């Protein structure tokens, strides 16, 4: 396994963690809150973004304008069934979601959720490290690499691991600050 591949896999873990953080509600309207919402549309689970134009007319409202008016009730149902805790307001052409300000208890809950997502990201990075180190050790046993090369590569892999775990920690600190800001 090449170091560039290891770094690429670790970067993808950080990006996945960032995407997961984007789905956490922070009290401000953000269209990425709806990224995980899928709608049962003509028998298939379809991402909401494929069925509607999503916008934020102001800092506390998300507007969803379906391309097909027949999907309005389906979209409303999907949002109600999601884990977002938001109540859709359907006026016949547009669905509006009012984002209420967060309570202190809800903020604490969201910080815990963010911490859990960050830990999952770190575990993913550590799994990449484990696989890379195992690969290097196998190459060492097979005689493809000297002991010094094995040790050097292991050190480089550990440095990459530390770098990307620090990135996840930075994202977590940023998200916690975002959640805690009233």
From Swiss-Prot:
Localization (cell): Cytoplasm
GO cellular component: cytoplasm
UniProt record, GO biological process: translational termination
Keyword Cytoplasm assigned: yes
GO MF annotations, alphabetized: ribosomal large subunit binding
Keyword Cytoplasm: yes
UniProt keyword annotations, A-Z: Cytoplasm, Protein biosynthesis
Gene3D superfamilies membership: 3.30.1360.40, Ribosome-recycling factor
Major location category of this protein: cytoplasm
InterPro entries membership: Ribosome_recyc_fac, Ribosome_recyc_fac_dom, RRF_sf
Protein family membership: Belongs to the RRF family.
Task of the protein: Responsible for the release of ribosomes from messenger RNA at the termination of protein biosynthesis. May increase the efficiency of translation by recycling ribosomes from one round of translation to another.
NCBIfam families listed in its UniProt record: frr
Protein name: Ribosome-recycling factor
Organism, scientific name: Cyanothece sp. (strain PCC 7425 / ATCC 29141)
